Amino acid sequence: MLEPWARQTLAAACQHGETILLSMDQTDLGNRFAILMISLGVGHRALPLAWAVEAGPANLGFTTQQALLERVRAWLPAGAEVLLCADRFYPSVDLFQWLAAQPGWHYRLRLKGNLNVDPGFGEITTTGALAQGHSERYLSNVWLFNEGVPTNLAIWHEPGHPEPWIIAMNDPPHRATVQDYACRWGIEPMFSDFKSRGFQLEDTQLQAADRLDRLLLIMTLAMYW
């Protein structure tokens, strides 16, 4: 049911050659449900495009991520350029490989600090060790995970923040490209629209994931309207 609105909104987002900004993130309703959502950045906010609901506390894995990403990919205008931002719970070998196979897709994936990385000099280390003591650092052609997934790394530690951004990307790493990751913050006020500052989704008495899925559709249509 959402497809016509999603297609129209995605087409409008790139009608003058702009890059389409997608974010992937998860929100939970206590321990009752986990909701993984892909949204479109619109100004300082976001619009939902596709989501999956699972009962119980969970980090929804690549199988679910891929299904949502491929649904959104099918709605994109031909030749559209895409930037996908995702938080540090989601990067995996499978996700990197999927993104590498998508023409016109760029990514900014935040990484945990405990991932193995071969920086191309010295010994294999961790992403956190590479970030230690640096406010900015940019590394091209590194190899992530034990499987050796090729990517670029940008590290940005803003004063006053407890943790740095460690961002994997398939574009040249520098200050401007690492700051692209801030585009994902539009998904946070969107989740607030669903929850405490809007529809009060956290107060739902629904017990079944499929019914919550339909409720999200109704709320999303209201956002598009």
Set out the residue ranges of the language-model regions.
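Active-site-proximal cofactor/substrate-binding loop regions of enzyme domains
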Residues: L10
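An active-site-proximal beta-strand-loop segment
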Residues: S23-I35
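Single, function-defining residue in the core of a domain
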Residues: L2-A6, C14-I20, N31, V42-W225
